[in-house]
């Protein structure tokens, strides 16, 4: 919509008329940038996400989606020949692909629930994605004779994030990808009541593929109840796809450890870390760990950069 600023005064209406840029992805050849923009309608009280592609120098900006569906989180795949993205056209949020000009759209996943974020493995053979898992019994579950009851009995924390009642937890899933669809879906936190990524703001940036596509690093605060509510002590875990084993590499750190990223050669892992438990606004430091030192009896403690 048009942005109207009258009398050189920024108004709420003008702010709502501005598009909000979301996810950004650079093509493998570094020549193009795909990104999402959210537009808001005050009369309809809702937003709509569209995708754009432009040249890396800022020229030739073009909109590649124009519809009522929600398209978001563009990612270049298949050597830059396709753009993968999330779309709810099928009735739930799934991974789709299309050409960089917006043609030849195709649905890639048909997962039973909404997919909230995703990342293809470096070798393109697997898909890491985020989906909600039920962790709390609803009133109807506890009292099947009262199927329409909406009351909630709270006996413990954490029962709410801002405007959202806690009934589910986001879990990371790994699946095989053959270029057209997924199979052999595995919940990395199967049977665990924890969140990864962490609510309320965490997304796919809290998980990372190893360059060899054989491991996934993820952020998790493995606590529940009151301990979860008062603590910021999250950790970086590494999940081995071949063995199914998980290793905590930041157990000594007491504050937030988030957003892991592997070095291109897979020898190091970097992440953001806060020093103290319980302080959400503590200083974020950048840590780098030499992964070859993890299994030594007295590993070298990583120092902030």
Where are these regions (language model features)?
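Single conserved hydrophobic/aromatic residue that forms the stacking wall/gate
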Residues: 294-305
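Short loop/turn segments that connect beta-strands within beta-propeller blades
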Residues: 55-59, 99-103, 177-180, 240-244, ...
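Predominantly five- to eight-bladed beta-propeller fold
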Residues: 49, 132-191, 219-222, 226-235, ...
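Short glycine/acidic-enriched loop and turn motifs that connect beta-strands
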Residues: 39-43, 89-92, 134-137, 223-226, ...
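Surface loop/turn motifs at the tips and blade-to-blade linkers of beta-strand repeat domains
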Residues: 15-18, 65-68, 109-112, 189-190, ...
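Hydrophobic beta-strand positions that form the internal "hydrophobic ladder"
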Residues: 33, 80-84, 127-128, 216, ...
């Amino acid at each position: 919509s048009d942005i109207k600023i009258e009398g050189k005064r920024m108004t709420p209406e003008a702010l709502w008329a501005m598009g909000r840029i979301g996810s950004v992805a650079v093509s493998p050849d570094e020549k193009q940038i795909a990104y999402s923009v959210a537009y808001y309608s005050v009369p309809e009280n809702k937003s709509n996400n569209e995708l754009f592609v432009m040249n890396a120098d800022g020229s030739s900006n073009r909109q590649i989606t124009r519809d009522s569906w929600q398209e978001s989180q563009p990612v270049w795949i298949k050597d830059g020949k396709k753009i993968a993205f999330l779309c709810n056209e099928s009735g739930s949020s799934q991974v789709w692909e299309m050409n960089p000009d917006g043609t030849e759209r195709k649905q890639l996943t048909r997962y039973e629930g909404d997919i909230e974020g995703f990342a293809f493995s470096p070798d393109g053979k697997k898909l890491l994605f985020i989906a909600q898992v039920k962790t709390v019994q609803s009133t109807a579950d506890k009292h099947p004779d009262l199927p329409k009851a909406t009351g909630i009995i709270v006996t413990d924390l954490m029962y709410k994030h801002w405007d959202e009642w806690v009934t589910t937890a986001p879990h990371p899933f790994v699946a095989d990808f053959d270029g057209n669809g997924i199979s052999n879906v595995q919940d990395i936190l199967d049977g665990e009541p924890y969140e990864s990524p962490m609510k309320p703001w965490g997304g796919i940036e809290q998980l990372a593929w190893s360059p060899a596509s054989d491991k996934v690093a993820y952020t998790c605060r493995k606590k529940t109840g009151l301990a979860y509510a008062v603590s910021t002590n999250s950790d970086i875990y590494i999940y081995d796809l071949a063995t199914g084993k998980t290793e905590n590499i930041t157990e000594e750190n007491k504050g937030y450890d988030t957003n892991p990223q592997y070095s291109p050669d897979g020898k190091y892992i970097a992440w953001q870390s806060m020093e103290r438990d319980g302080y959400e606004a503590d200083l974020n430091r950048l840590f780098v760990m030499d992964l070859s030192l993890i299994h030594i009896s007295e590993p070298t403690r990583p120092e902030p950069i």
